[in-house]
């Protein structure tokens, strides 16, 4: 047997998150299997991110990352210090999202074909032969050494003598069952009860976070994993994303835009319920601003609530700031150039301007020969 490394698990959660993909063991009605991608916290063992797809593509990995950061954001957690991944599905992001220091401080690329190395491989087995085997039908491997780990199969006695009845499920059923299994898995007692008495995997994740973790910059992160759309700044005030308006934080942001160019790229990540709380806008790869939803107010004064009054005040402040910038000349009004002036400008011919000749550098090579100085110094002794 080839020697392998002996390691110990750390002390703090989110110090390292290990990711891996797998096929759910039970087949769909077309005979194929659902592709799943998990993110496990190494210390607590809890699943902090998951995603499903009918196909094993890079979008499966991105969906898992989105789900993980939604979980971290929802629970007020900081960015993991290290990610452990394999080259499969992830290598396309090696120069961006998966480059150490861009989003995550550390990235661990596992060696291909070495399943011992990746912690998520062990967690997949622990989840499959633990909670899944107890709560789902048909979990196991027909060639498993232990009979308890073999699925129960009903044989069909025909001329082939190799036919078995296999129950199939819909895609939605398999995904729902696996999400329930994840919730049960996270709620189970932590395997090391001597170290974490009475605590579940999720309890350890929340209570023992690494104190050196840093908050994450959504403006940078969402550019890699967020949803993207092209939009336009309207009325020097807002942009529209998914049929909703998101306002600029200040009229001064307009100065960051290129002249006469109001087209921007918007990046965002909806919550679990589909709500978009923030939109991060870029122009030609340069960050411009973070936009929040524009609060509309009821124009019927008799029906206005405190919310409507606050929304009216907020919009009025923005307009007042814009008017002040116009008055101060920071934003120029659009003017019309006279035809004569425009014609003169277009007829101007570019002329080459001669550059003054550069003076030759002085020759200091004579000063580099120190033998003459040594001779004079000796003569004076």
Regions flagged by a language model, labelled:
Residues 169-330:
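C-terminal, beta-rich DNA-binding module of retroviral/retroelements integrases
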Residues 45-46, 286:
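Residue-level signal for well-ordered, solvent-exposed loop/turn and beta-edge residues enriched
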Residues 289-381:
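Extended, compositionally biased alpha-helical segments that mediate assembly or anchoring
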Residues 1-38, 46, 59-64, 71, ...:
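Mobile-element integrase/transposase regions
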Residues 63-86, 312-318:
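Short, solvent-exposed cationic patches
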Residues 42, 52-57:
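A short acidic/small-residue loop/turn micro-motif
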Residues 77-82, 87-215:
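Globin-like tetrapyrrole-binding proteins
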Residues 41-42, 282:
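Short, acidic, Ser/Thr-enriched surface-loop or helix-capping motifs
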């Amino acid at each position: 047997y080839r020697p392998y490394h002996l390691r110990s698990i750390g002390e703090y959660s989110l110090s390292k998150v290990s990711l891996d993909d797998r096929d759910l063991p039970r087949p769909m009605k077309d005979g194929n299997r659902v592709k799943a991608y998990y993110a496990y916290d190494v210390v607590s063992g809890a699943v902090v991110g998951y995603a499903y797809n009918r196909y094993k593509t890079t979008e499966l990995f991105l969906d898992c990352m989105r789900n993980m950061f939604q979980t971290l954001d929802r629970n007020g957690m900081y960015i993991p210090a290290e990610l452990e991944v394999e080259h499969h599905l992830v290598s396309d992001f090696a120069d961006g999202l998966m480059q150490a220091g861009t989003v995550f401080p550390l990235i661990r690329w596992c060696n291909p074909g070495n399943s011992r190395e990746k912690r998520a491989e062990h967690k997949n087995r622990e989840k499959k032969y633990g909670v899944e085997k107890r709560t789902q039908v048909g979990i196991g491997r027909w060639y498993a050494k232990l009979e308890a780990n073999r699925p129960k199969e009903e044989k069909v006695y025909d001329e082939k003598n190799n036919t078995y009845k296999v129950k199939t499920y819909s895609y939605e059923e398999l995904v729902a069952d696996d999400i329930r299994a994840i919730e049960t898995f996270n709620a189970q007692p932590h395997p090391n009860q001597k170290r974490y008495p009475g605590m579940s995997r999720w309890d350890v994740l929340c209570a023992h976070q690494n104190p050196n973790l840093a908050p994450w910059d959504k403006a940078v992160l969402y550019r890699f994993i967020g949803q993207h759309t092209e939009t336009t700044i309207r009325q020097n005030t807002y942009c529209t994303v998914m049929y909703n308006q998101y306002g600029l934080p200040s009229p001064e942001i307009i100065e960051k835009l290129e002249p006469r160019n109001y087209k921007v790229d918007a990046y965002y990540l909806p919550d679990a319920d589909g709500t978009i709380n923030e939109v991060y806008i870029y122009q030609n790869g340069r960050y411009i601003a973070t936009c929040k939803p524009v609060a509309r107010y009821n124009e019927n004064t008799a029906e206005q609530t405190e919310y409507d009054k606050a929304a009216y005040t907020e919009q009025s402040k923005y307009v007042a700031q814009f008017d002040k910038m116009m008055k101060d000349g920071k934003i120029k009004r659009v003017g019309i150039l006279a035809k004569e002036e425009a014609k003169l400008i277009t007829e101007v011919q570019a002329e080459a301007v001669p550059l003054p000749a550069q003076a030759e550098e002085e020759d200091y090579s004579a000063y580099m020969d120190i033998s003459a100085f040594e001779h004079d110094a000796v003569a004076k002794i």
